[in-house]
Amino acid sequence: NMAIVDTDMHMTAPKGLTAASGIDAVTHALEAYASVMATDYTDGLAIQALKVIFKYLPRAYENGQTDVEAREKMANAATMAGMAFANAFLGVCHSMAHKLGAFHHLPHGIANALMIDEVLRFNAAEAPAKMGTFSQYDHPKTLRRYAEVAEALGLGGKTDKDKLENLIKAIDELKEKIGIKKTIKDYG
């Protein structure tokens, strides 16, 4: 099996599709990085995908078919995020987004975008009761993992909680740049 990543195939994608698929790739990378199944291999893919998406998604959104570089970088970043989650798996945001999107007729990426802030906060809570049966999950690590993402993106913060909030703020700013509304109600 193989996949061909061809920028020409999505050069004319409308802004809404660019925004929804781009923020979906953000969620893919974040959930793969925070997964208890994450590895050194998936971590590298997820972090690099996030760096590229934060840099190039606003350009791909604004410039559309005139910015070949931004479209190419986004195609590669989405593929990297996909490779990360294909091996580390996804989390509760994607699970809920499937239900939310189906019920409210929302694009999948938009459904993810509407929940990602609260899911990040929920996942980062140091609640040992949430621990699963995975041997690699002997204590809560998700807050630290999100802090590592914030560090990789150069978002600053003194504590891990500060870094988490800076990451959420950066995601919210990205969503605003690409025209994603803030609430389910905003989508009717």
Regions found by a protein language model. Give the residues of each.
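Flexible, glycine/charged-enriched surface loops at secondary-structure junctions
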Residues: 37-45, 60-73, 88-93, 131, ...
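Gly/Pro-rich interdomain helix-loop hinge
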Residues: 103-106, 110-188
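Acidic-glycine-rich active-site phosphate/pyrophosphate-binding loop
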Residues: 2-3, 23-24, 54, 87-93
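Structural motif
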Residues: 2-3, 24, 82, 111-113
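C-terminal and late-domain segments of enzyme folds
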Residues: 16-80, 84
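Glycine-rich phosphate/pyrophosphate-binding beta-alpha loops
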Residues: 79-112
